[in-house]
Curated annotation (Swiss-Prot):
CDD domains registered for this protein in UniProt: EF-G, EFG_III, EFG_mtEFG1_IV, EFG_mtEFG_C, EFG_mtEFG_II
Extra information: Present in outer membrane vesicle formulations which are used as vaccines in human.
Family to which this protein belongs: Belongs to the TRAFAC class translation factor GTPase superfamily. Classic translation factor GTPase family. EF-G/EF-2 subfamily.
Gene Ontology CC: cytoplasm
Pfam families (UniProt xref): EFG_C, EFG_III, EFG_IV, GTP_EFTU, GTP_EFTU_D2
Protein name: Elongation factor G
MF terms in GO: GTP binding; GTPase activity; guanosine tetraphosphate binding; translation elongation factor activity
tr-type G domain boundaries: 8-290
Claim: Lyase is one of the keywords in the record: no
Positions contributing to GTP binding: 17-24, 88-92, 142-145
Length: 701
């Protein structure tokens, strides 16, 4: 089957924004104009095509990035038909792992800002992620029809808060209720969209008299930005010659792809104005898969760097970037194909796990509908059905040419909550549901607490876990109760001791006898956690019983004597003991070792350890004092401060996890929502006496 759309006409783009900047409405309009949806879905009534999970429709926030395919050949049908793969990304801080994952597979992004709210904290986080993956981007200032809308203020905020280099290529005609269209600075004409057909057609008109001067000034800025693309253009510009429209677009494209400028447009998605011109800008200024550098990776056999060109002729390579459960077909694995071609029925290699996978059916998504396709070619995005063991971030490739594409880094979860099924019937379903959800979302973990037998779920924040519990209920019909957030404490010893225990029972018939002497000492914190050394001389304990001593101690480690938390960082030497020819058994030595360990721990000055988090807060300078004071109150140690590169400060600190619950809410209110933070586990360290006492009390409570 030959390629239908040349790879140069592909645009893989993300629509990214802060909550409530109107991103979903913008995506919805894109789908409408590109001919996919005939009735416009409004987020206001929960009908948007890309918000296809029920909770998103309810909460009005976009949680999962849906990949949608559509086509565009220009407002005036001036381009050959281009194929867009649009990835909708979430804007809430608990879902940054989703945003990061989408950024990895995009070639370009459209950043949507609210004309009233401007650059918001989440916009800064997303901007940093786009910088990390070097994604070329456009900015679209939405909601120009709202009270307080101001396009030029957002241009300034992009410079000061994001340290961006925005270059408007349109400016608004009017604002608030009077917003009627835009001035196209390339053509120096106003564009007025037809309200009757929801903006599908438009007319060019003269620039309103009161805007001519402003338009001239912004056109000059745009031409200067274009001229900086090459010496040749700069000479032409400085020599007083006019640059042609083609030269300007070509130069702006070159600088956008290099990340030197960010072209800016504006409109009101809700009022069907401006999105159409932005789609033309995507064609003109954002990259095709062939415009970006070859994807880098590592050959798993040689561990040497390798790469793949975006070409059908190359060997197949793709990245699995999203898992979704679909109630009709089961697991959907979204893949971005970087090179080569894959057909349904092909067998490919999962190079991360070293396993083979058969590609079942391949489908292309239009928000929540799907079309079966026979093959996917370089530069395209599709979903595969029937993959057995593929997790987000893994590479699929040709068996004859293995490669592991850059791994995505996922943060460690920081919050644990116990979940209990409400009924016996829910118990089995819950296990299946949680395992499926963990496969979809690498920042979410599930484990069983050995002491209580409870199921513990861990994630990136309280909202993250709320949504997981919600999805269990909706998608799998599991009703569950959830506990309060918990901290994972540990225990250890502070001094070396010697302990002895003799387990001897004689009650008629075969007795039990095991006798051990152990030396216990603290190990380097954060090391292996436990080490067992056999120092028995002269067979005082026979060889076959030595592993039982080790096992007896290992089985006791999960329940320490301070507050019943797992014991870490202890070294045990088995130095002496005795046995009985008839009465000694493996069980007797396990019991003796377990008791000797408990005895030793009591003498060894036991301590409670608490998890310490590395916390980074990015805040505007004026809130710096409040942020530092608050971290100190939380028993935090501030390690340093840096400029964050976008006009604010970055504070680095180490803070006990126990003090960080509810932090995002407190930080939001202390900084009017302008600071953001990230935290990850750093180390365990000894908890102060009063904290240890309180924890112990609560456990025994």
């Amino acid at each position: 089957m030959a390629r239908k759309t040349p790879i140069s006409l592909y645009r893989n783009i993300g629509i990214s924004a802060h909550i409530d900047a109107g991103k979903t409405t913008t995506t919805e309009r894109i789908l409408f104009y590109t001919g996919l949806t005939h009735k416009l879905g409004e987020v206001h009534d929960g009908a948007a095509t890309t918000d296809y999970m029920e909770q998103e429709q309810e909460r009005g926030i976009t949680i999962t990035s849906a990949a949608v395919t559509s086509y565009w050949s220009g407002m005036a049908k001036q381009f050959p038909e281009h194929r867009f793969n649009i990835i909708d990304t979430p804007g809430h801080v608990d879902f940054t792992v989703e945003v990061e994952r989408s950024m990895r597979v995009l070639d370009g992004a459209v950043m949507v800002y609210c004309a009233v709210g401007g650059v918001q904290p989440q916009s800064e986080t997303v901007w940093r992620q786009a910088n990390k993956y070097q994604v070329p981007r456009l900015a679209f200032v939405n909601k120009m029809d709202r009270q307080g809308a101001n396009f030029f203020r957002v241009v300034e905020q992009m410079k000061t808060r994001l340290r961006a280099n925005p270059v408007p290529i349109v400016i608004p005609v009017g604002a608030e209720d009077n917003f009627s269209g835009v001035v196209d600075l390339l053509k120096m004409k106003s564009i007025i969209w037809n309200e009757v057909d929801k903006g599908t057609t438009f007319t060019y008109g003269d620039i309103p008299a009161e805007l001519v001067e402003t338009a001239e000034e912004w056109r000059q800025n745009m031409i200067e930005a274009a001229a900086e693309a090459s010496e040749e253009l700069m000479d032409k510009y400085l020599g007083g010659d006019e640059l042609t429209e083609e030269e300007i677009v070509g130069a702006l494209r070159q600088r956008t792809l290099a990340g030197e400028i960010q072209p800016m447009l504006c409109g009101s998605a809700f009022k069907n104005k401006g999105v159409q011109r932005m789609l033309d800008a995507v064609v003109e200024l954002l990259p095709a898969p062939t415009d970006i550098p070859p994807v880098q990776g590592v050959n798993p056999n040689t561990e040497e760097a390798d790469s793949r060109q975006a070409s059908d002729e190359e060997k197949f390579s793709a990245l699995a970037f999203k898992m979704l459960n679909d109630k009709y077909v089961g697991q959907l694995t979204f893949i971005r194909v970087y090179s080569g071609v894959v057909k349904s029925g092909d067998t490919v290699l999962n190079s991360v796990k070293g396993t083979r996978e058969r590609i079942g059916r391949l489908v292309q998504m239009t928000a929540a509908d799907r079309t079966e396709i026979e093959e996917v070619r370089a530069g395209d995005i599709a979903a595969a059905i029937g993959l057995k063991d593929v997790t987000t971030g893994e590479t699929l490739c040709a068996e004859s040419a293995p490669i592991i594409l850059e791994r995505m880094e996922f943060p460690e979860p920081v919050i644990h909550i116990a979940v209990e099924p409400k009924t016996k019937a829910d118990q089995e379903k819950m296990g299946i549901a949680l395992n499926r959800l963990a496969k979809e979302d690498p920042s979410f973990r599930v484990r069983t607490d050995e002491e209580s037998g409870q199921t513990i779920i861990s994630g990136m924040g309280e909202l993250h876990l709320e949504i997981i519990v919600d999805r269990m209920k909706r998608e799998f019909g599991v009703e569950a109760n959830i506990g309060a957030p918990q901290v994972a404490y540990r225990e250890t010893i502070r001094k070396a001791v010697k302990a002895e225990y003799k387990h001897a029972k004689q009650s008629g018939g075969k007795g039990q006898y095991g006798h051990v002497v152990i030396e216990m000492e603290p190990m380097e914190p954060g090391g292996e956690g436990y080490e067992f050394i056999d120092e028995i001389k002269g067979g005082v304990i026979p060889r076959e019983f030595i592993p039982s001593v080790d096992k007896g101690i290992r089985d006791t480690l999960p329940n320490g004597i301070v507050a019943g938390y797992p014991v870490v960082d202890v070294r045990i030497r088995l130095v002496f003991g005795s046995y009985h020819d008839v009465d000694s058994s493996q069980l007797a030595f396990e019991l003796a070792a377990s008791q000797a360990f408990k005895e030793g721990m009591r003498q060894a000055s036991p301590a409670l350890l608490e998890p310490i988090m590395a916390v980074e807060v990015e805040t505007p300078e004026e809130y710096m004092g409040d942020v530092m004071g608050d971290l100190n109150r939380r028993r935090g140690v501030v390690l340093g401060m840096d400029d964050d590169g976008i006009g604010g400060k970055k504070v680095r600190a180490e803070v006990p996890l126990a003090e960080m619950f509810g932090y995002s809410t407190d930080l939001r209110s202390a900084t009017q929502g302008r600071a953001t933070y990230s935290m990850e586990f750093k180390k365990y360290s000894e908890a102060p006496a009063h904290i240890a006492a309180a924890v112990t009390e609560a456990r025994k409570g």
